[in-house]
Amino acid sequence: MLRVFSLAFVALSMCYGQASAQVALQVRFAPGTKSTSETDVKTHQILTLAGMDVETRSSTFSITTKTIGERAADGTLPIQEKIDVLQTEVGLPGGNTLQFDSSNPEKKAGNPLLEPLLERLRVSFQNPVTVILDDKNKIKEIKLPEGVLESLDASNKSLFDPVKRKKAAEQARGYLPDEPVKPGESWERATEADFGGGQTMSFRTKYTYVGTVEIDGQMFDKITGNVFEVSYSVDQAAPIQVAKSDLKVTESNETVLFDRGLGAVQQLQRKLRIEGPLTLVINGTNLDGKLDLTIEEKTKRQK
């Protein structure tokens, strides 16, 4: 009886140990390697002002290759991020559309007022970004090709600012937990999104480690995310100001499949919907309105 009890206790201990085992989820950078991923982003926005709906839609498909260089003597590591394919279509009020296709990047906008938007896409496609990591794999700086910033107009310059790019790059991988986690454990992150024109949205997201899942014979670590707080702000120098806003997250779901062996994201899928009233100040006049914004994103590692 004692032997049976001992075996049962050992089995129970093993099961408990497996259930509570912690895993470390860390991004890895193997010098001299390449990886390619494709991303599909869709947005739908309805901004209601003075009783009129202003609706815009956009869809962007991109294929990006990351090339990891070799460690320098000081321990720094360069990673070049190059967009191989970029296709964007924007539906604007009044039935107007804006299209960009990297197979014909120099094609001009039908409406000259929209040319700055196309120029932003051209610059993104034609200029690889280099991320420099330090000896501890923290982002040290972001480098753009020489002369890129100087060539941009004021409306686009902030989107390519190396300091802002560094912050965005840190956020892009900052959702991973700082410490080893076990299934069911959660953590929170605060992030910002720069929409250009001095507009910034700030988010708070709760992430949860679900555990391992098997897909096509391969094991991945699954993480889910839920945005639970959002705020909207505009720089004081912007032509349009926000007097007040009460935006809420009405729909949020995010799923990440992480390849622990490679130390890389295999797949990311998220959807976020934001709704609520806001008051804009345009030419000194307060305009009450409401915002309904939906953002969907799918990213998958190809190789």
Regions found by a protein language model. Give the residues of each.
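Signature of exported/secreted
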Residues: 19-303
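N-terminal secretory signal peptides that target proteins for export/translocation
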Residues: 1-2
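Bacterial N-terminal signal peptides
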Residues: 5-16
